Design a protein with these regions (language model features):
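Boundary/entry segment of secreted carbohydrate-active catalytic domains
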Residues: 1-26
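Acidic (Asp/Glu)-rich catalytic clusters
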Residues: 25-32, 50-69, 85-100, 139-144, ...
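Gly/Pro-rich active-site loop or hairpin
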Residues: 48-50, 81, 121-123, 128, ...
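Acidic/histidine-rich catalytic cores of soluble enzymes
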Residues: 142-225
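Long, charge-rich, low-complexity alpha-helical segments
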Residues: 283, 292-453, 519-573
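Low-complexity, glycine/alanine/valine/leucine- and proline-rich hydrophobic stretches
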Residues: 462-544
Length: 573
């Protein structure tokens, strides 16, 4: 096994142009705050360079700030082994970056290279069969790469299997010999599912085989007698996790890194957490520092060895033994059964209906959030409540996301909505769907056209047009109705999305147009609003080549407002 160096304290990032925190800003502003960066990006390094703008910065500055690759595109469970093409890309990626290891949650992340929305993986059943299936995946990946694969405990919100997650991971380590990555938030999520203390079952867990620890933010909510922890890196770290980290650090004698997954935190806020973690995790591994076992910082250390007693005494077989034939084949039916369950498919006899409902709720919320960036009004009209979202998430259209065709969630939702509107004759929903389809078409035409060069022109990401029906009341109602329902939900603890049905009534009674509309695309989302008539006049004047100097005083005043509103650009700006 490759040797593992001491890495220290790291910060995670997604490498997008607006992703925060920026680890290189922190490195420059506060030297010594972090020792490495851990990041997610496409497996193919060339694709990462094209799609993740900060990947080039990572490569340029990796000698100042070493990097560890933490992909979210790597299956360590599921119906099929990772493709040879993906593994070749992963191998090339790790070589280019010089990542000392790669870690990933033991879960099903994608099917035929289509990731599940929000990268919400499907965790394996915590059973003996699940161990064998995951072991086959892990062995397949490890055989294709030149650095150690760290196995991370996945987060769950419902009970599925007869093993504690720590027992599952210990057995998986015994079966494969792979080092472990312990995610404290994921562990807390499991403990709450079973009503256990945060440290339950740690006494029998091989903490000495943990090479990396993840700590991140999350949210704890209460439903009846149950409490649930939702892993949300954009939230502050909870005190329960700081306390758990302090208690287990002295026992993690093989530890090489602690990573703060801080996605979405402004740099000054992230620095506060890093300062607290730095008191526990030294830059150099020195004797007795923070209770971590002594080691020479300059010496590369052997990767944690297989726990022989666990593999023999617990009957899991040795790490050198290949996974049984058909281990992955046996996962296919179970994987798709769980896929359907966590998306809301009806089922009898599930062991934890309350936990499963929490899991489905979280997943549907993420699906709705993604749809609302492209089809907010149509989603409200056709799938505004939980039942509607379940219908979509269990539909053939949704399943087609994962058939290898390359279709994206917004397009798949639009196809489903067209079918539902046609088959169920939803009065008003047809007008809403037609309007948002028109919006997409108009923006696509504007964005495909060469940029304007006139003295007055539309701002980037802006389009104006005329729709044959006046839906201005619909836009008003969508804002006020959502606010009304959100305010009630904040007090009552229940979001009654069925109330969004009123939008169909309003669209059905819309007055004839023409109706002037302003469209904006911001960060991938589309927003529509009625267009100020004075702005529309300016757009027409601009199309005829008018300059600011040509405008009468009233139009020049309107031009100033349009420029300030980000609708028009005047002159060379």
């Amino acid at each position: 096994m490759t040797q593992l160096p001491w890495m220290g304290l790291g910060l995670s990032t997604n490498l997008g142009p607006r992703d925060r925190p920026d680890p290189w800003w922190i490195l420059d502003a506060s030297p010594g705050a972090i020792d490495f960066v851990e990041y997610s990006a496409p497996l193919d390094p060339d694709v990462a360079l094209a799609e993740a703008p900060r990947f080039s910065t990572l490569l340029e500055r990796r000698h100042e700030l070493p990097a560890i690759f933490h992909p979210v595109h790597l299956n360590l469970w599921g119906p099929a082994l990772e493709s040879e093409e993906n593994l070749a890309a992963l191998r090339a990626h790790l070589r280019r970056v010089g990542s000392p290891w790669v870690g990933n949650d033991v879960a099903w992340w994608h099917h035929r290279d289509a990731p599940f929305p929000g990268y919400l993986f499907v965790a394996p059943p915590f059973t003996r069969a699940g161990v064998e299936q995951a072991a086959a995946h892990a062995a397949h990946v490890q055989a294709a790469i030149e650095v150690p694969l760290l196995l991370e405990n996945p987060a769950v919100l419902h009970r599925n299997g007869d093993l504690h997650v720590l027992d599952f991971m210990a057995a998986l380590h015994a079966r494969t010999g792979q080092p472990l990555l312990l995610d404290l938030g994921h562990l807390l999520a499991f403990q709450l599912v079973y009503g256990l203390e945060a440290e339950a079952r740690l006494d029998g867990f091989p903490l000495e085989q943990v090479a990396e620890i993840h700590i991140a933010g999350g949210v704890i909510t209460t439903r009846g007698a149950r409490r649930f922890y939702v892993d949300d890196h954009g939230q502050p770290v909870r005190e329960e996790l700081f306390a758990l980290l302090e208690r287990i650090l002295p026992r993690c004698t093989g530890l090489r890194a602690v990573t703060f997954e801080a996605d979405g935190h402004p740099e000054p806020i992230a620095l506060r957490t890093l300062e607290r973690l730095r008191a526990l995790v030294p830059r150099r591994r020195e004797p007795q520092a923070a209770g971590i076992a002594a080691a020479n910082d300059d010496a590369a250390l052997e990767a944690p060895a297989t726990c022989a007693t666990a593999s023999q005494d617990d009957g899991w077989g040795s790490a050198a033994t290949a996974a049984p034939p058909g281990a992955v084949d046996g996962a296919a039916r179970e994987a798709w059964r769980l896929f359907d369950l966590v998306h809301g498919a009806p089922a009898d006899g599930v062991p934890d209906p309350d936990g499963l409902r929490a899991e489905v709720d979280f997943r549907l919320a993420v699906v709705a959030q993604r749809i609302d960036r492209a089809w907010p009004l149509t989603r409200a009209a056709c799938a505004g409540d939980r039942a509607g979202l379940e219908r979509f998430a269990t539909s053939p259209e949704y399943r087609s996301l994962f058939d290898g065709s390359g279709r994206q969630l917004p397009a798949v939702f639009a196809a489903w909505a067209r079918r539902v509107v046609r088959e169920e004759r939803l009065a008003g929903a047809d007008a809403i769907l037609a309007f948002e389809s028109w919006c997409h078409g108009l923006l696509a035409r504007v964005e495909a056209a060469p940029p304007g060069s006139g003295a007055i022109r539309l701002a980037p990401g802006v389009a104006v047009g005329s729709f044959p029906v006046d839906l201005s009341e619909l836009l008003f109602a969508a804002r006020t109705l959502r606010r009304h329902l959100a305010d009630r939900a904040a007090a009552a603890g229940l979001y009654e999305g069925s109330g969004l049905e009123a939008l169909r009534q309003i669209a059905a009674r819309a007055a004839p147009g023409p109706w002037a509309v302003l469209l904006r695309r911001t960060g991938g989302a589309i927003a529509a609003e009625p267009l100020d008539p004075s702005f529309l006049r300016l757009v027409h004047l601009a199309a005829r080549g008018a300059t600011p100097a040509d405008l009468p005083p009233a139009d020049r005043e309107a031009l100033g407002r349009a420029v300030a509103a980000g609708v028009l650009v005047a002159g060379d700006r």
